[in-house]
Amino acid sequence: SFIVTANEGAVTQWRSFGGMRLVRQQGWEILADSKFAETAERMGNEAVELLTADNCPSDTRDLILAPDQMILQIHESIGHPLELDRILGDERNYAGTSFVTQDMIGNYKYGSDLLNITFDPSRPEEAASYAFDDDGLEAKKEFIIRNGNLERVLGGGISQFRAGIEGTANSRADSWRRPAMDRMANLNLEAGDTKFE
């Protein structure tokens, strides 16, 4: 990964590339696939653009997010709130709870009809991939949001049993001596047929 910094007087802007977006279960080929070298010039230009850009307007507008910001948005606004142990209150003293409640599953409009989010830990190239979660459930692709509607939450076998609802195979522990927790893995915004422009 790398960071590019642009500075003029008391104003500094920076852009970065790599980090978590380059975490894969791959080797050297990830650098070629990511066009790592070619990206350096683009990041430099973006840092200068940020440095010289006008301040963002403060009125209400429609917003289209580019992929690099969309990754974070999905992680924070969809992933964590849909972890069933948070919904059940298990995380309230550590990482907080969720605005999502059990009665919202199947009844909540999470976004526009264009929003389709899948959970897919079966993708072999991704860092958060596995065949079975730590509750022994088989990992497979599942829609959690389809056409903007919340269909299911991210809850492993134990949380599913406690809540009496269907979830996903996402119960994972970071060690044999720690309890498994419901954690997102490989959330994907499914491609539609709308052009970015």
Model-derived regions: residue spans:
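Internal alpha/beta scaffold segment
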Residues: 2-86, 152
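Short N-terminal signal/transit or membrane-insertion segments
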Residues: 62-93, 161-173, 181-182
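Dual-mode signal for accessory low-complexity, basic/Gly-rich regions
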Residues: 92-197
